[in-house]
């Protein structure tokens, strides 16, 4: 389950009081190092407060408090997206090369077919597709707009 990370800031002109617990921040304890939090910036995740450097993935150690990062919490472990998918994601097979797609790999999906990024290319001319390119899915083969006529002539009907 993905969790949100709340970033808290204490402004110099504000009373240093936590909004939720009504406690002075110096009485807050970090969920990681168990030390008092006296920093101006701190995080709240998994119902605990954290120093920015203490909230990290339990497996790879990457910082989870950075902007754009997601925190996944499962079976008592704090995980980054990559490690969460590696442990709990589902693997599958590429519709083109039929090799394993690991759960953390980037993929392209067309209907019920899944492809490695490097396999998502025209079956006729081998050109990789860009955003906005038009193509046709014929069985598990992807054919670019320019090659559709030639492909169907050589390989039979579209349907």
From Swiss-Prot:
GO terms for biological process: blood vessel development; blood vessel endothelial cell migration; embryonic hemopoiesis; endothelial cell proliferation; erythrocyte development; erythrocyte differentiation; fin regeneration; hemopoiesis. Pfam families: LIM. It is found in: Nucleus. Residues 28-90, 92-154 form the LIM zinc-binding domain. SUPFAM superfamilies: Glucocorticoid receptor-like (DNA-binding domain) (SSF57716). InterPro entries: LMO_RBTN_TF (IPR050945), Znf_LIM (IPR001781). The keyword Metal-binding applies. Signal peptide: none annotated. Transcription factor that acts synergistically with tal1/scl in primitive and definitive hematopoiesis, and in endothelial development. Specifies mesodermal precursors to a hemangioblast cell fate. Hemangioblasts are bipotential precursors of blood and endothelium, and in the absence of hematopoietic induction cues such as gata1, tal1/scl-lmo2-induced haemangioblasts differentiate into endothelial cells. This is Rhombotin-2. It comes from Danio rerio. The gene is lmo2.
